[in-house]
Amino acid sequence: MALRLITAGESHGPGLTCVVEGLPAGLEIRPEDLNADMSRRQLGHGRGGRMKIERDTAEVTGGLRHGRTLGSPIAIQIANRDYENWRERMSPWPAAERIEEVHLPRPGHADLVGTQKFKQSDVRNILERASARETAARVAGGGLCKAFLRRLGVSVYSHVLQIASVRAPEPERALEPEDFASVDSSPVRCLDEQASRAMVREIDELRRANESLGGVFEVQAFGLVPGLGSHVSWEERLDGRLAMAICSIQAVKGFAVGEAFAIAGRPGSEAHDEIFYTSERGIYRETNRAGGLEGGMTDGCPLIVRGAMKPLSTLTKPLRSIDIATLEPAEALRERTDSCTVPAAGVVGEAMVAVVLAAAFRRKFGGDHIDDVLEAVAAYEQRIEWRR
């Protein structure tokens, strides 16, 4: 059983659409399963004026009845309130008057290559879809997948590890789900209070200097059975699917599983997670350097992945570029922008990890109704004698 998510819509168009196909029938869905994470995506110190306009809420137009999935594709609409200010410029239909084109691509953005690839003279035909506004739809779809995972005993969280030059200290112990209870109370979604304050100062300082900031976020998932994914074919390896999902988030340029870059510099005896067994605990590991993935499969430990985000490519003090109509030197486009979206990227990362994990459960366990899935998972857990 395949699960997939597809989105449509432009940043300043009428709205965004998300379709999730492949969830079983009978799964209970509440409005807050979608809307809560969309609100969280709008949080974070360093966001721009757009967040004062948009108040994202999901309107389900298909696939649900009376709060339960039907087994058919689920369609979600999210209105762009800012469309009222762009109605003529972003109308789906021919405009009555000539609309001024944008000819100034931003270094680091999809602008230039997109106009070359799709034979466009107007950069706006590229930048509108390339915008991270699209992630609002992904987060809505991810909310459906999170609801499915919760029914299976799986929870997904995120936090920020680094913004610009400020990095939070590594946790002294493995994190537990309850450790994430207060993460959204931090203005940068960082678990360390001292680092959180330093990150806010860094954002303010660089914003005054007309700069944007990148950073690193981490996503963790708890309650995963061993054996999601596979070693038998490259495209079935779960770490590869997760890498694609995280790196598909706008401005994300790097990915890591567990202690990947740290263990690259260690001897093998200090890089792997030794395996133990007791009658009380069953099979277990004392460490989780692998980040919950071995051989392309979940190993029963918490899944830990990280995404590295570059500074945003829209700057209030633009970089040098060219005018694609004249090929003359010019400053890049000035567009309303955020200074830092690393906290929001963590929420998007949760959604993308949830989509990948939900798809992995569907591939392994199938089932037309949620009860079928639960029975299949329970039978598998009994066969491998796995203990949560």
Where do the model's predicted regions map?
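Generic N-terminal targeting/processing segments that precede catalytic cores or assembly contacts
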Residues: 1-388
